[in-house]
């Protein structure tokens, strides 16, 4: 019994040391995001570096069609983006491999998503060690990751406050 307890405690200690070492998405703040190009539901290509030539910030939202918090935050993201469209570009990328472009297009129409929508063909979510969705990144000049947030935002105001904070820094 004593050996079993010692073994369990040793395993728990190892796990507690390993978890902080994991590459959590938040740990990528300050890093440069690899440039990427993805096809959008509009049939056009979205390239991160090109979007940053015309916008101060790019918001990369990683989501899935089956994710309730993702669906809940899209109307808020849309509303905020419409107010900031001249300075902030948004690309929403599904991380669900099973989501076809037809499924994504219908989903975007259903949720009134007018910003760019596509699939995470560049595997951003995986490269950032993503485990939870939605995960949203703010990218600034030079493709620098300024912020990473896991979980949905509860209002358009939450997005606009976030945009204002990082526009002021750029």
Regions found by a protein language model. Give the residues of each.
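Positively charged n-region of N-terminal signal peptides that target proteins for export
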Residues: 1-7
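Bacterial N-terminal signal peptides
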Residues: 8-18
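N-proximal helix/coil linker or "cap" segments that precede and/or mark the start of modular domains
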Residues: 19-35, 52-54, 106
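A short beta-strand-turn-helix
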Residues: 37-58
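Short pre-active-site segment immediately N-terminal to redox-active cysteine/selenocysteine motifs
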Residues: 56-58, 62-66, 132
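Hydrophobic beta-strand anchors of alpha/beta hydrolase catalytic cores
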Residues: 59-60, 90, 136
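Structural microenvironment flanking redox-active thiols in thiol-disulfide oxidoreductases
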Residues: 71-111, 119-127
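Thiol/disulfide oxidoreductase modules built on the thioredoxin-like
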Residues: 106-114, 119-166
